[in-house]
């Protein structure tokens, strides 16, 4: 049994911090519809956004909690998932002392945020089939290791990590295991959200930028124990999610049928593109995927990338990433966009 204790990993200055209290925080338990607000030095003339937004985004959290069978107190929202990830560093990692573990090839912001926050990033490569090397990860852990980052389904490889590997890390690591589920909606695997109450050191990040089609509003989600969320709430900026973002998110989150249709279309087009890539003569390998993209190994990634750019098709060249030499990542577009990509791929020499 993992004897995880939030107090042992929280930074001392954060533990003693008295968080900033915004004007609106003081009235969250009141019916504010008829109240006159003269407390925050706002412009009083109504235009839809003249007032500060709800600092706790309660109406958005209520929908997320209902949709995912969790509690509002287990949710933190951020200005994109990157803000959520940054808050984790700032709450739990002491600069120039602590370290985190990431598993390349993976999402690059874990390493970037480690550098920004003066935290050592210990990289443990995935296996050749892109699975965690659990024993090597645990061997790399020391008393100053605060977070292990797992991206599952993984970017840029597209595959999910085995349940056995994740459980072993959750059970044997006394810091936070952060599972980045940005692409979970495209996978047949169940989200780790169902295990939050089982593992107090489990943190899950999700986003509205992928399956929900709201990359432009920047809304990231963190699910964790109430203890972890309470620490993050102490250090988050008071109005980190603006009113327009909150309104648009609520509209979209209530339209689950349309979202499911779009996800189904993306998965259908993913399978179409996958079949074509397997037949293209310069494609050497197509990796299994549970995301809205496909990673393919080609004969010359730089050459093929530039050829597609000349045709007006922008993909991602991942050849500089560990274990991804000569690999290209194809995001799945609409049926019409996919048709153009397929046509041009067949014409390339």
Curated annotation (Swiss-Prot):
Q: Which HAMAP family match?
A: HisC_aminotrans_2
Q: Which protein family is named in the record?
A: Belongs to the class-II pyridoxal-phosphate-dependent aminotransferase family. Histidinol-phosphate aminotransferase subfamily.
The metabolic or biological pathway listed in the UniProt record of this protein is: Amino-acid biosynthesis; L-histidine biosynthesis; L-histidine from 5-phospho-alpha-D-ribose 1-diphosphate: step 7/9
Q: What is this protein called?
A: Histidinol-phosphate aminotransferase
Q: Which cofactor does it need?
A: pyridoxal 5'-phosphate
According to its UniProt entry, one GO biological process term is: L-histidine biosynthetic process
Q: Which reaction does it catalyse?
A: L-histidinol phosphate + 2-oxoglutarate = 3-(imidazol-4-yl)-2-oxopropyl phosphate + L-glutamate
Assembly and partners are described as: Homodimer.
Instruction: Kindly list the GO molecular function terms attached to this UniProt entry.
Output: histidinol-phosphate transaminase activity; pyridoxal phosphate binding
What is the uppermost EC class here? transferase
- Enzyme Commission (EC) number: 2.6.1.9
N6-(pyridoxal phosphate)lysine modification, residue list: 210
Gene name for this UniProt entry: hisC
Arranged from A to Z, the UniProt key words for this protein are: Amino-acid biosynthesis, Aminotransferase, Histidine biosynthesis, Pyridoxal phosphate, Transferase
